[in-house]
From Swiss-Prot:
<dbReference type="InterPro" id="IPR004881">
    <property type="entry name" value="Ribosome_biogen_GTPase_RsgA"/>
</dbReference>
<keyword id="KW-0342">GTP-binding</keyword>
<dbReference type="InterPro" id="IPR030378">
    <property type="entry name" value="G_CP_dom"/>
</dbReference>
<keyword id="KW-0378">Hydrolase</keyword>
<feature type="binding site">
    <location>
        <begin position="113"/>
        <end position="116"/>
    </location>
    <ligand>
        <name>GTP</name>
    </ligand>
</feature>
<feature type="binding site">
    <location>
        <position position="262"/>
    </location>
    <ligand>
        <name>Zn(2+)</name>
    </ligand>
</feature>
<keyword id="KW-0699">rRNA-binding</keyword>
<comment type="similarity">
    <text>Belongs to the TRAFAC class YlqF/YawG GTPase family. RsgA subfamily.</text>
</comment>
<dbReference type="GO" id="GO:0005525">
    <property type="term" value="F:GTP binding"/>
</dbReference>
<dbReference type="GO" id="GO:0019843">
    <property type="term" value="F:rRNA binding"/>
</dbReference>
<feature type="binding site">
    <location>
        <position position="254"/>
    </location>
    <ligand>
        <name>Zn(2+)</name>
    </ligand>
</feature>
<feature type="domain" description="CP-type G">
    <location>
        <begin position="64"/>
        <end position="225"/>
    </location>
</feature>
<keyword id="KW-0694">RNA-binding</keyword>
<dbReference type="Pfam" id="PF16745">
    <property type="entry name" value="RsgA_N"/>
</dbReference>
<keyword id="KW-0963">Cytoplasm</keyword>
<keyword id="KW-0547">Nucleotide-binding</keyword>
<dbReference type="GO" id="GO:0042274">
    <property type="term" value="P:ribosomal small subunit biogenesis"/>
</dbReference>
Amino acid sequence: MQTGQIIRALSGFYDVQSEHKIYRTRARGNFRKRKITPLVGDFVEFESESQTESGYILEILDRKNEMIRPPVANIDQAVVIVSAVEPDFSLNLLDRFLIYLESLNIQGLVYLTKTDMISDEKYQEIKQYLDYYEKVGYPTFAPRTAFTPEIIQAIEDTFPDKTTVFTGQTGAGKSTLLNHIDPKLNLATAEISQSLNRGKHTTRHIELIPLNDGLVGDTPGFSSLGILNVTSETLVSRYPEFREIGQDCKFRTCQHVMEPKCAVKAAVDAGEIMQSRYTNYLQFRAELKDIRPVYKKSK
């Protein structure tokens, strides 16, 4: 029996990396009976006679996290790709995804693409927004000139000893960026649907690729995103700046809405917390309160 990590899943097969070798495997039949699905990123115990013959996954080891969209396990960090235009830059969509990452204890990074398609004035506006995200704990990359050796190196420097996924809105340029990081990847790039101002999905499967002493994955994009893995009560803890400043609120359980002597609301008024972050927070709370619980029917 050996241990390794699933780096690719395709058509019922799972490629497992173990000691720098790749083994093709299938999941044992009892996984289906136990309603367990192996995920890319899973650490597994498996058996295989050789690299040329299919082996079997025997057990999935405990996951430290599991992304639903995309379905990947044991992720250390996620580079969220946002475009300046086509599709349009959206703070709301960025906040939704960062909230999701916070809920899974995944470090979020933000990379801005298509800056060559906007004016200097628009670039400075977006850059000011992203500077705020950098300040509250999300490393950001917003190059005025795309794909310079310096910016590619800066991204690569985050890879060692980590499993990283690249994700973001469809058509924002995830695969294009990865192609510049390593041209051998030759990943398909997206075309933009002009009528919807959204991209066409091009990444068909999920794969982790060894890059710069780490594993990197390009994942299928999304054109919209609900609020995942959070409730109206836990939402407040998904904002790192709220967690820090909220310690000075009068009430320990302050939700920063109607409560008196709220340090977060005071920080918004003082310009210490970006207004859009708080506005989106209130919107997300309202959306979550409208979600009705789904109850399983009794047999």
